[in-house]
C-alpha cells in the first residue's frame, strides 16, 4: 500500500545542510549534458569549464557533449535527465523540487558543499535522488552567493518593518516564489531569458537574482534599487541519470567525482570574489541598497515559506 513519504529524512537533510578496481579497457563513453541559463552567464561558463575539466581528466573513458542552450526547456531539463533523454544537467535544486521536495533544504542551506559532504548531507541528497527520481546527485558548484530582490522604484516598508510590495509586479521562479507570496507580492513566473523583455515592456518591475550576474543580464538598466539582506544561497547541482551513471566503470566514476569536488571549491572562491567586485560596480553606477528594518523577520519568512512548501508537498506523496 503506498504510504506518504516520511518527514524524518527531510529533517535529517535540513540538519545536515544547515549546520574501483575494474581495469579492463573499454571504449570511451559518450554522455550528453544540458544547462538552463544563457551562455553569457557566469553559471553556464562555470558548468562548461567543469565539463572541459572532466573531459580532459577522463580522456579515453568519458566524453561529455554539451547540447545547445534551450535545446530542452529550462524547467523540463531535470525530468529529461530522469527519463534518460539526456544524461546530465547542471541546475538549481529548486527547479525540480516538486519531484524531490527535500531539495528546499539545499536552496536554503547556509553551508558549503565541503561541509555538507563532511557531515553526510550530500549522501542523503544523493539517496533521495536515486530513490525518487532515477538520478544521482554528484555535487553542487557555484555556491557562496545568495539572492536579493531588485526593484525599479525605491522600496517601501510597512509599519512592521517588512517590505510593502503592494502594486509591485514581481518576477519569480521556483526558488523564491513562495517567499514572495508570503510577503504579499503579486508574482509572475518566467525564466531568466524572458525577464529583460518583460522589464522593457513593464510586465514586471521587480525581480530577485543572485548576488552575481545582474549586470551580465543587463537587468540593472531597469532595476536600480536592491532590498537587503541577502536570502537563501546559490546551488548549481550536477545531476546525472542513474542508469547512465551505473553504466560507467568505477575509474570513470571516480574521475568525475574528483573533478566535481575540486570545482566545488574553486568555483565557490571565484564566485564570492566576483560578487564582491560586481557589488562595487553597482555602487559606483548609482544603485541604492535598502536595508529591511525587520531584517531577521524577513529572513525567517524566507526559510519558513520554503519549508512550508516542502512539507506540503511531502504530505501529498
Language-model regions, residue ranges each:
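A gly/proline- and charged-residue-enriched helix-loop-helix capping module
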Residues: 112-132
